[in-house]
Design a protein with these regions (language model features):
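Phosphate-handling DNA/RNA-contact segment within nucleic-acid enzymes
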Residues: 1-98, 116
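Short, small/acidic-rich helices and loops at N termini and domain boundaries
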Residues: 1-5, 139-154
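Acidic beta-strand-to-loop metal/phosphate-binding motif
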Residues: 59, 100-111, 133-134
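Short, acidic/turn-prone active-site loops that include or flank metal/cofactor-
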Residues: 81-86, 107-109, 136
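Mg2+-dependent endonuclease catalytic cores in nucleic-acid-processing enzymes, primarily RNase H-like
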Residues: 92, 110-121
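A polyampholytic, Gly/Pro-enriched intrinsically disordered region
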Residues: 97-108, 147-154
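Short acidic, glycine/proline-enriched helix-loop-strand junctions
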Residues: 123-130
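A generic structural motif
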Residues: 130-138
Length: 154
């Protein structure tokens, strides 16, 4: 994992995997690194263990999106690990912890928009209120500023 910033991903007190992101862009090195590399993320919302006493969460695609949102003060933000990884199991986890309202803040690209619509439909099936937060082009939750976040999440 040399050359990577590594983040251990826990859920329910158990280490599920380690995710790394390259500190530099090298053509011979993948940008992201996950060990074990065959880990199934369909049942992981991170950091679910740390989101407590709230019925409202913000869903973002990646760990670095989540870290930025937490740094901005939004400690109810959960990472879903990509646009294709919001599953029925994750929906059940949100239901289990009592979530009744969700803001979906995915990247403003075709994949993010399509996934946000899918997540909204899944949440609707459980009567969980949701809204899609439309980010300006070129801005994802990983680089969002405090002022812009406050304006978008009103």
């Amino acid at each position: 994992l040399e050359g990577y910033i590594c983040i251990p991903v826990y859920q329910f007190g158990k280490l599920r995997f380690i995710e790394g992101r390259s500190r530099q862009t090298l053509s011979n090195q993948p940008k992201y690194y996950r060990r074990p590399d065959n880990v199934e993320v369909g049942d992981i919302l991170f950091p679910l263990d740390k989101v407590k006493n709230t019925n409202y969460v913000i869903l973002v695609e990646g760990i670095y999106d989540m870290l930025n949102m937490w740094q901005l003060g939004y400690k109810n933000t959960l990472c879903v690990f990509g646009t294709n990884n919001f599953t029925k199991r994750k929906l059940e986890l949100l239901d289990r912890i009592g979530v009744t309202r969700v803001d979906i803040m995915f990247d403003p690209d075709a994949a993010g928009n399509k996934a946000a619509e899918k997540v909204t439909n899944m949440l609707d099936s459980r009567n969980i209120y949701s809204r899609i937060i439309k980010l300006p082009n070129g801005v994802d939750p990983g680089i969002l500023t405090k002022d812009l976040a406050e304006n978008l999440l009103r």
